[in-house]
């Protein structure tokens, strides 16, 4: 199933349309404790109209575990979810990765919608069909390829994001420009991510997503050209380990 990416100008309108166009008997929304407070209010009225059940997990990648996944399965089960239910993942990459995997495996697969709320999730984690959890001390060790029905991208969520997380996502956009073209690279280098124009950033995010979508369409399961999207991971992770404060998330 191919996912549809919506570059949204009106998050409530676009989410309402996506929910309406996706078969469902019940709606569940997965957040973490931060996005529940900072991001859920932007769509809360709409989700209330659909009698959505909220499932909240703890933030941070250290909680992207089998235990947390089981908590989500349990919440879906207790909430009466069926094969025809819909899960809306509202959060950063941890939420979209784990929520996508929960949806891909619960009842052998239910529909889900991703609403990424961090810049990195917008241009990377929420798009492309990779879902998963950490396991045995290894990142994304267990997972599945499963496309969201919709990925709804709106930079309105970035107004609460700190500088470190903005830079983390922007580094991924710089990588996309390096494997795309010189004009895109020049535009990205000259953009002020520390004082971003969110409307302009949204246009750039759309272009960055298009780079990833083009590659993923040719190699959905990462047997060949899709490995280009991992550009910088090998040396980047080592550099991060030795040069960054442990409180910072990754920049590659």
Per-range role (PLM):
Residues 1-86:
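ATP/NTP phosphate-donor binding region
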Residues 90-92, 231-232:
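Glycine-rich beta-strand-to-loop/alpha-helix junction loops that act as flexible
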Residues 249-252:
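Conserved small/polar residues in nucleotide/adenosyl-binding loops
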Residues 101-193:
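A glycine/threonine-rich phosphate-anchoring loop and its flanking beta-alpha core
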Residues 196-242:
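Oxyanion-binding "anion nests"
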Residues 94-100, 238:
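Short glycine/serine/threonine-rich phosphate/pyrophosphate-binding segments
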